[in-house]
Amino acid sequence: TDGGIHPRFGTRYFTLALKNGHYLEVVCPLEHPAADASPFGRVVSQRANEGGGWLTWVVSTEDLTPVENRLGRQAVDGSRKRPDGSELKWKQLGVLGTLDDSQLPFFIQWLSDDHPSTDGKAVAEIVKIEIAGDEKSIEEWLGSDLSRAFDGVEIQWVDPSTNDGQTGLVAVHLSTPNGVVRLD
C-alpha cells in the first residue's frame, strides 16, 4: 500500500499489512534536503547508497517515557500524510542508535488511532525473525526480556561472522496461506 511521503524526514513509504498488529515498511529517500537533515532520512539514505536491504526493526510501546528516561533522550515527533489524506502520528526514539549499532531497533509510540497494519487485508503473519547480533546487548537496549518484545515471534540468533560480519536484521519469515516465506 502506498504509505505516502514524510516531508520532515525526506522519505517515501510503502507498507505491507500483516496480522497481529505487525507490518513491513519499505522506505526510500527522496531527493530533498530533509533526507540529509533528519537522523531517519540519513539512515535511509545511507542504506540506499549501500545498495538497499533491511534497515532495522522497530519495537512499539504504549508509552515512550520510560525509554526516554532510561536512555536520557527525548523522542521525536513524526507524522506523514497518506495518499488518501489521512495522517499518521507517532513519536520515535533511538534512530541514531541504529546508525551506531545496526543490531539495535528503534522505538515507536503511535499517537493516532490509525496504524499501518490496517492498510489493506492482512493475510500473512510474522512467525520468525533472524537477527545477527548479541542477544545481551539488545536486551540491555530494550530494557526488558526479549520474549516480551517479540510476543510469540521466534527469534533466531545469527553469528555476525556468518553474515559477512554484519549485524542487524537478516530475514523475516512470514506464514502465508501458501506456506512460510523467508524474506532476506
What do these predicted ranges mean?
Residues 41, 45, 65-68, 139:
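Generic detector of well-ordered alpha-helical segments enriched in charged/polar residues
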Residues 17-57:
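Active-site-adjacent scaffolding segments
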Residues 8, 34, 113:
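Surface-exposed, flexible loop/turn segments at secondary-structure boundaries
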Residues 9-10, 53:
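Short, basic and Ser/Thr-rich N-terminal targeting/leader segments
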Residues 1-7:
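Conserved catalytic-core motifs of GNAT/GCN5-like acyltransferases
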Residues 4, 12-17, 22-28, 56-58, ...:
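Vicinal oxygen chelate
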Residues 48-51, 126-135:
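Short, cationic low-complexity segments
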Residues 1, 135-151:
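Extended intrinsically disordered, low-complexity coil regions enriched in Ser, Thr, Gly, Ala
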